[in-house]
Amino acid sequence: MSEKPILGVLLGNSAGVGPELVAMLALRDYYKDYCRPVIIGDLRMFEHGLKVVGGDVPHYAVDDLSQCDWTKGFPVLDLKDQDPAQVVYGEANAYCGASDLRQLDTGIELCKTGKIEGFVFGPFHKGAMKMAGLHDESEHTYLAHAFNLTTPFCEVNMMDDLMTVRATSHIPISDVSANLTETTLREAIELGEITGESLGHKPRIAVAALNPHCGEFGLCGREEVDVIGPTIEKVVKETGWNVTGPYSADTLFISALAGDFDVVVTMYHDQGQIALKLVGFQRCITVAGGQPYPIATCAHGTAFDKVGKASVTTDSFERAVRTTAKMALAKREKISG
């Protein structure tokens, strides 16, 4: 049980900063404290990332994970699909998007076959993935289809030990009320519970209000009275989970950031995003909530404006590695009883 988990480390979109991020952490030997990493992507792109950041580390290509020997350096599962000389850096393109999908497919298959316990990925580019044939809304939907999920899933935003999940997500603000139902709220609460448990504890879940001043007992909006409050009561009665609310959103994050809660369920996208990113954007990560394996990435994107400059900060990616490793260990302990 003390052995560190084997995690895939996907390079991310070749036109972005992903290969640099992966290389930076390798140069600092960061991974060894948390996992046994298997770098997944084109070997040449990893070497390109090392060149950009001005260093080198012992590394070697493998065709199968049985060939991994971490005493010899970093194993790279070489996908042989990205020539650094052909990459158009700082732009979304199908060539790099195809590699994004191939990296994801490889990570998924390695999880399914038990060869890795989860993976962390450098930033992908959704537009490039769609150019390459992605038909799903996002990589999270792509993962859910690959794992045949029938339970709630969504991206979960996390800063330090605080997570946020959403009752509604990528829809216009004018559509939020119509899409805020008992079903969508229950799914968000369930996702918060599942993701909290994946980190090894029973989470304290707070549910935000939608309207100012928590709706003022129906005088300033009915959602708290008609949907949010009754749904919380039903969930607590049926499951016994530690769920409370609704709380006025303008003050909820004060207590949440003070450590009173582990999960905040927000009613729409920016209600939680603004709070976390304002307080500590570099400390934020994205967890693939509800997936059967630990999967996470940094909160920022491909950062095309920083490509090739070795100037991107690594805080978020470091936290993604740590969190994925923590989730992998918690899952291992749960399975072993």
Protein language model features and the residues they cover:
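Short, flexible loop segments at boundaries between secondary-structure elements
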Residues: 146-162, 289-305
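Contiguous, glycine/small-aliphatic-enriched amphipathic segments in soluble metabolic enzymes
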Residues: 1-139, 183-267, 271-284, 291-296, ...
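Active-site glycine-rich loop that binds ribose-phosphate moieties when present
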Residues: 141-145, 149-151, 171-195
